[in-house]
Amino acid sequence: MTVTLADTVQEEEPHFEDEQILARKYIETLYDKVKILDTTFIINGLTYDIKCRHFCKKDNGLTIPKKYNPDIKKDFKTNNFATKLTITIGKNIILNKTIEKSDFKNHLDTTLNRYATLLFPYISLTNDTISVNYSISIPGTDVGRAFSFRIGKDGHFVVNGM
């Protein structure tokens, strides 16, 4: 039996436009979901209780220009996201804050300041520092950067690019 090129199955690579459509649809599924990241750590006898709620602000606060949406050739209206974070050590609340894109504004370029939002949070702990890590990205695109909101055990925080 001879196999020819016509007999083989050829898989198409996904089109960039298809990926963008899926990415926008995924972002839209997050509008009504609250991501809950609650955890407890015990380090050197201290109990760290972290309550984190990442949510859509439903503010229609972002208009992504059509140049970032070549498949639909029009602007994409979407929402900002934010994180409500409460950290307790023992019985003391050391931080009770809503984290928003504005907390990172001094570290963002003009494009991310205008069109990006906080996406895909996760929590990490290194020594006595709690980090809430994000992708600050333009929804529906691969344009963005990783950032970290780091909190010390005294409740003071700093913002870092990763």
Where are these regions (language model features)?
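Extracytoplasmic electrostatic interaction patches
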Residues: 94-162
